[in-house]
Amino acid sequence: MTFDVKILGCNSASFAFGRHHTAQLVNNNQNLFLIDCGEATQIQMMRHQVRHSRIDHIFISHLHGDHYLGLMGLVFTFHLQGRSEDLHIYGPAGLNDIITIQLQHSESRLNYTIHFHLIEENDQLLFENEDIQVYTVQMNHRIPCYGFVFEEKQRKH
């Protein structure tokens, strides 16, 4: 069973040469989950040879730019690469509006469907499959902010 985390970026809001805004990639049995999507996330994905098509779930912790401003670029890259599978985006109130408004104003129609999942509470179960469960943990920040707990399920022998 594979379960690991790759740090694509961990820099603060200010840009620094050689450091990138927040993004982490969780690999669970070759299923990739992206946590946050700061600017340059796609560059880091290319550097680490991460195929975009393997990401079906994106979790955004909060709406400070260093955690989500790379998301629209990634959404459009998925489209340009011919993605047809649904994409699930989990985030706080307002994220759906941000993405929807950008799609409307650019008169863009995606090849795939985005499903928005609103994070509303602490200890909320966001995702579950046969291997893992993903829960929220409320963080102490100036605006609503959530951490994500990826918990492996017990294997039956």
Annotate each language-model stretch with its function.
Residues 1-157:
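Binuclear metal-dependent hydrolase catalytic cores
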